[in-house]
Amino acid sequence: MALYKIGITEAGDAGVDLSWVEKLDRVDAAVLITKCVSPDFFDAALEHKDRLIVHATITGYGHSALEPNVPTPYEEFAAIMELVKAGFPMEKIVIRIDPIIPTEKGLSVAYRTMISFMEMGFQRYRVSVIDMYPHARSRFKKAGLPLPYGDS
């Protein structure tokens, strides 16, 4: 029998869909994954900060052809910093640089993003390289961008 029950927001975005709040009474803690530290998420995360770990995904491509519905990197960086300033523990935030696009520009964007957070004192990171799922391939083609792994 498990000692603790941990929830995780694997589907959707915890910053946009706050249905996780009402489910917190069924778990001991939760891992929230978001690309958008929205005002409602900000308030809920602060209220429940003792039971949460936040995975803040920031790729450096927010509000671009690749991630049109995601806040700009500057907006998301500022929102994450405000969350910490308001009292959410920095050590409970994992900066997710996900996905990294394996091109010279993509690696440079990922590097600059990580350095920005390192300079502010963040120590927990998670990275992954892009998988070219059909929806990702479609988004690249629609934006007129070359596929990082070629056409095959």
Each predicted region: which residue ranges?
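Core AdoMet radical
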Residues: 1-79, 92-94, 124-130
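A conserved mid-domain beta-alpha-beta active-site/ligand-binding segment of alpha/beta enzyme cores
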Residues: 135-152
